[in-house]
């Protein structure tokens, strides 16, 4: 099944973007070629843009504290697997401590590094990081891969508590949902939400159908419409019945 996820609010939208950026960053950082490390570095700059939002850290700390207070009363409950509960609570508490230790404006260390700032300013220009534009950057790219990797890991380290916090919140949100098998008649599906508030919707579709879900929702109803990509033209609506799995997640 192919998984598509749709956020219902701006906070989850930001966390999904952050998750995607950190996954891309980790992939390219693990590679050897300097061009791949260039992608890792420019992705780090994107991460800094997202995490630089003033209220992100405080939002994450509030949500983790809320989850801690929700889960802590289940300690000693015989109906709850205690080892798993303690693992989650320990992870939340450690991440909260790491967030509390973050000092100053998020990502300021990248701004204060004049060399990185020069690369960042050139990276937004198409072809702006050529060797004749940034000879010192080109020289750094000739260093051994492990040394480059250590440098980039050092630069991302102050942002990792935000990555860990986002991962916990998204994981708890995803685990809160229960998948149901539904059918989009003639490619369209709608469901009343009865005023319930959700953070995330997951749509899983069989890959052999080659369909693409498009979703929208408000506090009363959600809609899923399936389209199909055919060559270079825009996706078109399908008129076949599409079976899929729908999960609504609510922290």
From Swiss-Prot:
Major localization class: cytoplasm
Lineage, broadest ranks: Bacteria, Pseudomonadati, Pseudomonadota, Betaproteobacteria, Burkholderiales
Keyword Cell division: yes
Name by which UniProt lists this protein: Cell division protein ZapD
Function (record text): Cell division factor that enhances FtsZ-ring assembly. Directly interacts with FtsZ and promotes bundling of FtsZ protofilaments, with a reduction in FtsZ GTPase activity.
Family: Belongs to the ZapD family.
GO biological process entries: division septum assembly; FtsZ-dependent cytokinesis
Subunit details: Interacts with FtsZ.
Keywords assigned by UniProt, alphabetized: Cell cycle, Cell division, Cytoplasm, Septation
A GO CC annotation given for this chain: cell division site
